[in-house]
């Protein structure tokens, strides 16, 4: 079974809360604040495992959660950091955010990793808020919240050469001849239901990986048949070998097949269509009219395809020359990473200090994660806490934005359930 897409839920660890604590020692009646910071929450990290070849594991487990950070304690004890959760994925995995459908990462190298959900920062303990005028703060920061999201994993094969062509033209047979791969081979459409990989090793040329891409049919670029699920596997290949049944024993027209497959490639991706393509006229051992090959070759050469090889995968005729040409072409084409446009790239939102302000009559409502975090940290009924509260609003630009919106003396500012009268 080949699983090439998976959807999983990931959740990082929440940051530990800062501690509100004061020294309690014999003979020290009024000890100062000594609340420690909370620990950082664990990250969820995707890590490439070169030994993995499918996303099958994610059909059995779909939810992953990292450890939260420990809370701070007295005596300036810091909370323990939560452990990162490492999730292994195969090379060639594309990571997408489900909500936005944007690409987060392309994990195509053995050493690649990506933090898909960042752990929350630990909150500061009350000892961090001591100033010359505030020597006994009785508030501390809560830990930053965890990140959670659904992500989609897409596996795109890391093959150098892709075999394309209609079903039943001999791609699987060719793969079995040039490598040690043993794909399922039979005489019916869609024999290959998953891409098969093999390593081509020919004396005098560098080894390369070749993939037998499942049969493409007319309409594949629109999802017909095996469609888009398998076209995506061709995207990473640097050279395409287009296998054609030149024998016409099934009543197919080789030239018509050639045009239809290339039309599907062009509709799916112009870049894919422009990739170097070698034509392999297969089943030549069953061709009884040599003029048919010459006629076919002349027609495809008019489209700019000058590398046309007459082969027979069954008898191995012409196969070595075909593979050597593929190796030669590969040596001229550098390996490139997947290009991610700005439109498709996922941009992480800044979640630490986010807020918005809206006006209802003479009331200005401030809301957002910043507001929740601030109100959780302070006691608005305590004068020292309230002074700190107003200082934070000023430092973070809330007061300035309120004045730009035209707030006047006596107007009400509301943050969740807390309200105060604005004074210039």
Swiss-Prot record:
CDD domains documented for this protein: Obg
Top EC class of this enzyme: hydrolase
Residue ranges of domain OBG-type G in the record: 159-331
Domain OCT: 345-424
Keywords: Cytoplasm, GTP-binding, Hydrolase, Magnesium, Metal-binding, Nucleotide-binding
Cofactor(s) required for function per UniProt: Mg(2+)
SUPFAM superfamilies: Obg GTP-binding protein C-terminal domain (SSF102741), Obg GTP-binding protein N-terminal domain (SSF82051), P-loop containing nucleoside triphosphate hydrolases (SSF52540)
Residues given in the record as Mg(2+) binding sites: 172, 192
EC number, as in UniProt: 3.6.5.-
UniProt record similarity statement: Belongs to the TRAFAC class OBG-HflX-like GTPase superfamily. OBG GTPase family.
Function of the molecule: An essential GTPase which binds GTP, GDP and possibly (p)ppGpp with moderate affinity, with high nucleotide exchange rates and a fairly low GTP hydrolysis rate. Plays a role in control of the cell cycle, stress response, ribosome biogenesis and in those bacteria that undergo differentiation, in morphogenesis control.
Subunit structure, interactors included: Monomer.
Stated name of the protein: GTPase Obg
Organism: Clostridium botulinum (strain Okra / Type B1)
């Amino acid at each position: 079974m080949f699983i090439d897409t998976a959807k999983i839920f990931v959740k990082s660890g929440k940051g530990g809360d800062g501690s509100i604590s004061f020294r309690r020692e014999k003979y020290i009646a009024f000890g100062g604040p000594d609340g420690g910071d909370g620990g950082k929450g664990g990250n969820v990290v995707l890590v490439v495992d070169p030994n993995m070849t499918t996303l099958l594991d994610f059909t059995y487990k779909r939810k992953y959660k990292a450890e939260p950070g420990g809370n701070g304690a007295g005596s300036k004890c810091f909370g323990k950091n939560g452990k990162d959760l490492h999730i292994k994925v195969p090379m060639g995995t594309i990571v997408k955010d489900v909500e936005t459908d944007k690409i987060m990462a392309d994990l195509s190298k053995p050493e690649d990793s990506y933090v898909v959900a960042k752990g929350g920062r630990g909150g500061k303990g009350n000892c961090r808020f001591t100033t010359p005028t505030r020597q006994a703060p009785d508030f501390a920061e809560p830990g930053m919240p965890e990140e959670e999201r659904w992500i989609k994993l897409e596996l795109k094969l890391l093959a150098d050469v892709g075999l394309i062509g209609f079903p039943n033209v001999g791609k699987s047979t060719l793969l079995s001849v040039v490598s040690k791969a043993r794909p399922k081979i039979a005489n019916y459409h869609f024999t290959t239901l998953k891409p098969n990989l093999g390593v081509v090793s020919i004396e005098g040329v560098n080894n390369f990986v070749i993939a037998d891409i499942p049969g493409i049919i007319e309409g594949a670029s629109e999802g017909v048949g095996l469609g888009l699920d398998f076209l995506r596997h061709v995207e990473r290949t640097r050279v395409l070998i287009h296998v054609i049944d030149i024998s016409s024993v099934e009543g197919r027209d080789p030239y018509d097949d050639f045009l239809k497959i290339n039309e599907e490639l062009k509709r799916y991706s112009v870049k894919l269509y422009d990739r170097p393509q070698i034509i392999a006229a297969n089943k030549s051992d069953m061709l009884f009219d040599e003029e048919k090959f010459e006629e076919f070759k002349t027609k495809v050469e008019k489209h700019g395809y000058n590398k046309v090889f007459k082969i027979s995968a069954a008898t191995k005729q012409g196969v070595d020359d075909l593979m050597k040409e593929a190796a030669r072409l590969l040596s001229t084409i550098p390996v490139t990473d997947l290009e991610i446009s700005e439109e498709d790239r996922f941009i992480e939102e800044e979640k630490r200090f986010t807020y918005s302000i809206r006006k209802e009559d003479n009331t200005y409502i401030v809301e957002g994660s910043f507001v929740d975090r601030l109100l959780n940290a302070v006691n608005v009924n305590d004068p020292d806490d309230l002074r700190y509260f107003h200082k934070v609003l000023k430092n973070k630009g809330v007061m300035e934005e309120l004045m730009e919106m035209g707030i006047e003396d006596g107007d009400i500012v509301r943050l969740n359930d807390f309200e105060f009268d604005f004074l210039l």
